[in-house]
Structures are given as C-alpha cells and as structure tokens.
Amino acid sequence: MSGLTLGGGSGRVRPTQAAAAFPTSHDFADPDRSSVARNANRPSRRFAAPPQLSDDFSLESPTDSAQVHDNLLQDALFPEWKANSPRGVDSPDEMQKKDPLATQIWKLYSRTKAQLPNQERMENLTWRMMALSLRRQERERAQQQARASSQKSPVPGMSGIAQLRLSDRVSNTPTTTADTVSDAMNLDDFIIPFSPSDHPSPSTTKASEATTGAIPIKARRDQSASEATPVPASFPHPAQDQRRESEFGYVPRRVRKTSIDERQFFNLQIPSRKRPAESSPHVPPVSTSMLAHDPDFSHAVPEYTLDTSHGLSLQNQMNAQQLANAQNHTSPNMAFALDTFNLGDDPILPSAGPYQQQFTFSPSESPMTSGNPFANLYAQTPIASSLNSTDFFSPPPSGYQSTASTPQPAYDGEHSKYFDMPVDARSQRRVVPAYITQRSSNLSASLQPRYMYNQGGSSQDITQQNAHMGAQSSSMQSPGFSIPQHVDPTQVLNPNEFNGNHAAMFSFGADSDVEDDDGNQFSAGGLAMPAEFGDDSISDMNSNMAWETSYPNSFQSLPAFAAQHRKHVTIGSADMMDTPSEWNQGGSLGRTHESAASVSEVRNRDQDPRRQKIARTSSTPNTAQLLRQSMQNQSSHTSPNTPPESGLNSAAPSRPASPGGTKNGEQNGPTTCTNCFTQTTPLWRRNPEGQPLCNACGLFLKLHGVVRPLSLKTDVIKKRNRNSANSLAVGSSRVSKKSARKNSVQQVTPTAPTSSRAQSNTTSESPPAMPGSSGRGSGVVPIAAAPPKSSSAATTSPGTNNGCGAVQVAPKRQRRLEKASDVDMAESPSSTSSGGRSKVVPLAPAMPPAAVNPANHSIAAGQGASQEWEWLTMSL
C-alpha cells in the first residue's frame, strides 16, 4: 500500500487511445468513467493503483460492453459518489498536509473495500498502519513541546522543589493531553500493537509517568520488604513480629487458606468447625507459631506456661523471642511446660531439640522420603485421609519458613522430644490441657514422632495433674494400621493407671507373641534401655501402651525390639486383648468404635489357624509364655459369662475374643446364650456388647435388628440332611442332644492351675484318655475352639461303657461326624437314651473359653483344619 499514489502523480493510470474510447475494467468502479468518450472535456477520476498493476488496467474490452454496461452503475447504488460530491485534493503533498497519509489510505479503503479481494486482511493492515503513524506523530509532537519547555529558564525566585514540580507538570501536560484528547480514529487501546518494540503500551507509559511525577520518599530502614509485597510462606525468610511493631498494624493481614487462621482462634476460645467427623483428629491449634505472633495469647489460656529449653521465665519471654530472632531461631522456645530433661544442651545428642536449624527439607519434599533428616520421625506409609488443615501447626522458630511449613501434629501437654536417630519407638498417652475440649489424633500414618518419652513424674504427680487437666485423650496410633479413637474423652483412663516415672523413662513396647522373651534387645542401639524394673511396674506402665510395632501382619519401616514381658496377647494384625485391669476401667464404648480391623479379622479374631504365624505346640517357646499369660488371666476373670467393659486402650478391642468350646482344662461353666439361655447351638455368635448369643438369636438380631423374643425359642434344631449317613443316625443324634442339654448344667470339679497348665501342654500332641471314652470308637466329638486332630483321638484308651455315670460335661451341642463308624451303631433296632448318652464323649475336660485363656487358641491352632469352617462362619 505504500506504493499507492493519489491524484495526478506519476502513478496515475494512463489509458491508451483504445482505453479512452472504450471503458476498461477498472472504469466500472467510478460511474463517471462510463462517459469518458462522450465527455472528453471532463477530468477523469481514477483511483490510485500500484505501478505494476497499471498494465492490467489498460486491457481492452469489447466494443459493445460500453453500451451494455452503460447504465449499470448508477448514482442510486453509490449516492456518496455523485458528480457534485466534494473530491479530494489531487496533489499528494496537499493531502498529507491536511490529513496524514494513513488516514487518507483508510478513507480510500473505506470507499473501495467492496471491490478488494481480501477485505478483512486489508482492513486490519490499514488500521495498523494508521495507528502506527498517528502514534509516531504524537510522540514526536510531545518531544518537541518538552524540548521547548525545558529550554525556558525557571523563575529565579522559585525554590528547587517548586522548580522540580513545575518542570514535571510542564513535561507531563502534553503527554496527558495527547493521551486523553486522542483522534477519533485512534482505537489503539483495543488493537494489538503491530510492533511492540516501536512504542510502549499506553498503560505502561501512564504508570511510568505517574511514578516519576511524585517525590521519592525513602522507606524506613526497619521496614522489611516482605511487608510491602506479599511473600509466600515457603519463601525462606526469618519470621519477624511485624504486627505489633509496624505502624500499619491495625490492618488485618492476609491469611493463606492452607494455614491456620489465628484470628478465628483469638476470637473464639475453641476453633469452630462445620461438622467434625466422629473420630476425626481434634488437635487444638495452639502452638509456638501463634505465640510468636501474639505472646499475650498465653494469658487467656489457663494452666499454660511458656518455659523455654534454656530455662527462661515467662517475664523474659519477649526478650527471648527477640533474642531468638537475632540468633536466627537457633534456640527455639518450648511451650506447654514440657519436661525436656535438659537434653537441649546435651552435647551427646546434638539433635535433641524439637525444631532444628539443620532440617533442610522443603514443603515440596515428601516427609516419607528417606533422605531428609526427618526420615526417622515418620512411618513409611501413606498419609491418612482424615487430615484437616486445622489439625497441624507450623513452628516458626526453626530458622526459615521453608523448614517450618511442613505440618506436624501439635502434641499439647506431652513430654516429647524428637531425635534424628534410627530408633523404633512407642508413644505414651498424651495429656491435653483442659482449657479445650479433649481432642484426639487420628494420624494413622505419617505425622507421628517415632521417638517419644514416657510421662514424667510419679503417679501422685499425674493424679494432681489430672485434677486440672481433666480426662486423658486417647493414645497415639500405630503407623502400620488404623486404631479406633475413643468417643467419650471423659472416661478414657483412670488417673491411677499412670505409673510412669523418670526411672522408666523410655516406655518402649514389650514383646508380643512373635518374639522370644530374651530381655532387652534394642534394635538400632544408641540408647541403653533400663532393664532393672520389676514385673509389676512394667505391667502397669505398659498397660497404658499406645501402639505396638511388632504385630505379625503389620509392615514397619524399622525393626521391632523386645523388652520385658507385657500382660497382653497380640492377635492377628491390629487387635489386642489386654488384661482385665484395662477392661475393668469405667467407660462406655460402642461397638461401632471398636476396631479398625477388617470384618474377617474381627470374625476370625484368634481361632483361625491361618491367622497365626506358627503352629503353637509345646515345643515352641511361645507356648510357655502364653500359658503364663493364661494363668494371669484366669485369676482375674470371674466367669466367662461376664464380658469385660470397653477396652480403654485404643489398641484393645471393645469385646473379648470369640467364645470357644470345651478344651483341655475347662474350669468354668458352659457358654450360655444371654438371650434365650440355651446351651445347644451349632454356632455361637455375639451381640454388639460382646456377649455370647446362640445361632438363632444372633441371626435374628443380625437380620431384624431386634432381640429375638423368647416365644420363638424351641428345643428342636432342625438339621439338614447332607448325606445318607446323616439320615441313618438321626434318632441317636437327637437323643445325644437331649442328654447333652440335660447334663450340660453340671460342673466339673475345678483343678489347680498347675494341673490345667500341665494338661494344656499336652493337648497339642494327643488328647488324654478320659473315663467315659467309648471303646467302640464312635467318632462323636464336641465342637472345640480349634479343630481336633481326628475323630479317632477319643479311642486312645478303653473306658467304661455302662450308663450315664461316666458322661462328661458337654457345654455345647454335640455334633456327630458322618463317617462309616456311625453305620454299625445305627444297625441296632433301638437306640436307647442310655446308649445315646454313652456315646456322647467330649474330647477333653473343660477349659476356660477363648476370652479367658487365649493360650489355648494358639496351642490348638496346629491340630489341623477339619472343622475350620465353624470359625469361618462366625459373624456379627
């Protein structure tokens, strides 16, 4: 378009004689061109065209085209191009003086845009050309005016500031006028600039001019740059107390959504939530991060002190914080009156402090990685899904915000320290101050310190502390699996259960059933474990143990270790059956909060032999240990029909183990249904409280949700015909059921615990012979807690076969095995009741049920799996 010329320049199309006689192809663009031959004296109006296109316009047209298209383009189609319409100036110089070239080009385009081949592209190009030329002219005009104003000397009587403001006002006035009073064709604000390097955008120009016009004011030296510009929390800058010292402290600062809003906690003593979950973590967000911003907040909290690791008092708290800021927070403050045992200054343990300067990981680095210094503080398992942003705090006195922004749970009121050592550790129960509702932690995986101290002080100190601390919250959870939380925090533990002292400072967990009782073997070394405490102190201390890391089916990142003996039996993966000292504590815990184990683990709690790691026999060292535990449990339980109250340790189930049948050494009465009081049922079940139910009552409760009425009770249990052998022995089996019901009320004479222990050692080899064993080998066996070896086990020695005198107690309904040995018994025409009674031979004398003597489960676990389906069908 730069080659276009207007008027009578050199670029004018000069038609030949033939073109003058006949209209050419471009003559139709102007209605005046159609009468060129007739009105030769009229000046012809031709629009500009590039020189290279001038030859194309001189092409001749047919002679008759002038007559055919003479009246085609009339004035009605183009009213603005009438003969009397004003025409432009022929000279390009005169037109450029009056109007810029770009404006003239736009006017030319607006007239001829209907005939252009690429209308939209040409429109865009002409607009850009016009905008560039107009902007360039305005800039040159402004520079000339600025030069002219700067050459004028200021008034000699004016001061320097007045002269500066006058020069700024004069220099800014033309630019402002050029920006505000713009041409009507200047739509540059809505157009992308053609060349960004040619001219700046109007917004940039205005902003730069506005800043240069003001007088620069020096900022205060103590005013940090982070106050002017918002800095993310992950940016490494020391935390400073700017809210009180800055002069704009009344302006509320902007709080990130991912951080704790302290203002909400300042106004409300208890942080408000929309709807906390039933067992969600409730950690009050009171930490040193809030105290750094507002140290006066500690006065609003009762029973709250600010003892630092250097022994600074509460009066020197302000000076201590300023000192910590000056020292780049290498000596942090310790809140909640933690007994740190002066380990912060221990030269042997350089990383004894809770927040170290050497921690060099960022929020983008996962805490589960093994390369950072926090690798030993976290379990190598994924984070649980029940984490809320308000449950964590970021401790600022760690030097930089990048190291403090990784969330950690606030263990309020806990005597805890962190160590950067490869040590597997167990935690004691946390004591939370009573100024806030008791809130427990549900961090099942990653954010748990792996190295914690025991509760300091004697039991009297703990009792006094509980007087103002309120009830204790639930204990920490294992990093390998989930453990339920206590719903009622006011009935968690009795205060006299806390017997830990400084002598037993490290309350690491005791051995379980997968470890040998070989004293104190410490996994990683580095700290000697005290081994000179007695059995009573260990049992009392370990009764409050929070979680174990040596379960058979749990996967830990660090190896477990063994300490003194503990009074509990580890079962399966996540369930723990403690002594009645834990069970007899007051408390109400519903079944829904019982355990986080799966349904199959609850169902097969400890009778399923497949859940055991090894077959428990008398040759394994675990058998003697379990028998010793069973002796302790026997002396504590009153009867198997009185189940314990809710297990107050979070690792303990809220019910005892599944009820077992008769085993060697039964000392208590038979299992009785708590609803219909029957003792003959093919399958024992449990209600939500853990009490035994018969199969009928349990199924009725499970299906209908209500207790089975006693009107539905019947003495007849219909049995399905599974095979032909069963149908042959129906009569004798019913007689044996009746005799079992009649005789099951009797009690066997109790034997000494030593005798039951001696008998328990022999059960895995072969059951001993009993008086009343049938010499015919009738294969009638009771439903034992674990599957017996074979039906011929009862024939090891002959016995008397006369009458009912030798019949032993059968606490459960006896099931007749359908084997070939039953056929000869059914050959007799009549099965008398006495004969039926004589066939009912239990496998062994009575033993305590599974809830009382857990050793019998593991002992009998290796005897085969002939009746394994009985315990696989345990439900509810």
UniProtKB/Swiss-Prot annotation:
Residues 198-211, 399-408, 455-480, 615-640, 724-734, 742-766 have a biased composition (Polar residues). Induction: Down-regulated in nitrogen-sufficient conditions and up-regulated in nitrogen-limiting conditions. Coiled coil: none annotated. It is found in: Nucleus. InterPro entries: AreA_GATA, AreA_N, Transcription_factor_GATA, Znf_GATA, Znf_NHR/GATA. Residues 1-65, 137-159, 192-248, 393-413, 451-498, 573-672, 724-856 are annotated as: Disordered. Residues 721-742 bind DNA. Keywords: Activator, DNA-binding, Metal-binding, Nitrate assimilation, Nucleus, Transcription, Transcription regulation, Zinc, Zinc-finger. A zinc finger (GATA-type) spans 673-697. GO terms for cellular component: nucleus. Residues 602-611 have a biased composition (Basic and acidic residues). Residues 1-11 have a biased composition (Gly residues). Residues 782-798, 828-855 have a biased composition (Low complexity). GO terms for molecular function: DNA-binding transcription factor activity, RNA polymerase II-specific; RNA polymerase II cis-regulatory region sequence-specific DNA binding; sequence-specific DNA binding; zinc ion binding. The keyword Ligase does not apply. One of its GO terms (biological process) is regulation of arginine metabolic process. The keyword Metal-binding applies. Pfam families: AreA_N, GATA, GATA_AreA. Transcription activator that binds the consensus DNA element 5'-CGATAG-3' and mediates nitrogen metabolite repression. Activates the transcription of uapA. Interacts with nmrA. This is Nitrogen regulatory protein areA. It comes from Emericella nidulans (strain FGSC A4 / ATCC 38163 / CBS 112.46 / NRRL 194 / M139) (Aspergillus nidulans).
